[in-house]
Swiss-Prot record:
Coiled coil: none annotated. HAMAP family: tRNA_methyltr_TrmB. This is tRNA (guanine-N(7)-)-methyltransferase. The gene is trmB. One of its GO terms (cellular component) is tRNA methyltransferase complex. It comes from the Bacteria. Its EC number is 2.1.1.33. NCBIfam families: tRNA (guanosine(46)-N7)-methyltransferase TrmB (TIGR00091). The active site is at 144. Belongs to the class I-like SAM-binding methyltransferase superfamily. TrmB family. It catalyses: guanosine(46) in tRNA + S-adenosyl-L-methionine = N(7)-methylguanosine(46) in tRNA + S-adenosyl-L-homocysteine. It is an enzyme of class 2 (transferase). Substrate binds at residues 148, 180, 217-220.
Length: 239
């Protein structure tokens, strides 16, 4: 498992890489059990970052629709979703080591076979590792809203990243976003409105009801108890 989750200033081809990231590398505490899970199970479930496109048939045991989740947090809901849909393959991306360890622990506990995870910056993974026209669904649940205006440049779901996703989804593939930030929800709608390939699946062209397939996370439960409203956005890729 590689510990460097951000590519250098230039990649191996000498191409200048972006410097503004949608996350901050905090020195969060990784527990002993999380470190143990990484040591035991990374070789089975983890996928190291690389500068060339993945061959999904080489990392998954069975050919199946691929669902990508960006920023899976503890991984508990991702693992449970993978368990609920064994006929699909799941790929998760996370930048925090504690989340990687936690996800590996859950996956090993449930003996999940249809899940692989990457410990790296999602934008670099999308640029370098995800082949075009391969994903049946991309789900991004509760990304950091970066509330302060001067930090909006750090937001993951900007127009440029949303356009990258269109290249990775298959036709009729789904982009599903959930956030508890109303301002971020409307920001996303504004960023995506000019990308003609996306069809908003909301009848009112804004938000949809939470689908049963999206498991309510501990983070979400806490927010609901505090009276926060959850916004689900769902788009389908069209020709």
């Amino acid at each position: 498992m590689k510990n460097n989750i951000i590519t250098p200033r230039y990649n191996l081809e000498g191409v200048f890489l972006r410097q503004i990231h949608s996350f901050v590398c905090r020195k969060g505490r990784t527990t002993t059990s999380q470190l143990s899970a990484i040591k035991k199970y990374w070789s089975l479930i983890g996928v190291d970052f690389q500068l060339n496109a993945l061959n999904f048939s080489s990392i998954f045991k069975h050919r199946a629709p691929i669902i990508l989740e960006i920023g899976f947090g503890s991984g508990e809901s991702l693992v449970k979703t993978a368990m609920n849909f064994p006929e699909k393959n799941f790929l998760g991306i996370e930048v925090y080591k504690s989340g990687i360890g936690s996800c590996l622990h859950y996956a090993s506990s449930y003996q999940i076979q249809n899940l692989r995870i990457i410990y790296y910056d999602a934008t670099e993974v999308m640029y370098n590792m995800i082949p075009d026209d391969t994903l049946s669904k991309v789900q991004i649940f509760f990304p950091d809203p970066w509330h302060k205006k001067r930090h909006h440049k750090r937001r993951l779901l900007k127009n440029i990243f949303l356009k990258i996703i269109t290249k990775k989804l298959i036709i009729d593939g789904i982009l599903h976003i959930a956030t508890d930030s109303e301002s971020y929800a409307f920001y996303i709608l504004d960023e995506i409105k000019d990308i003609k390939n996306y069809k908003n699946l909301s009848e009112k062209n804004n938000f949809v009801k939470r689908p049963v397939s999206r498991i309510i996370t501990k983070f979400e439960k806490k927010g609901l108890l505090q009276g926060k409203k959850i916004f689900d956005l769902m788009f389908q890729l069209k020709k």
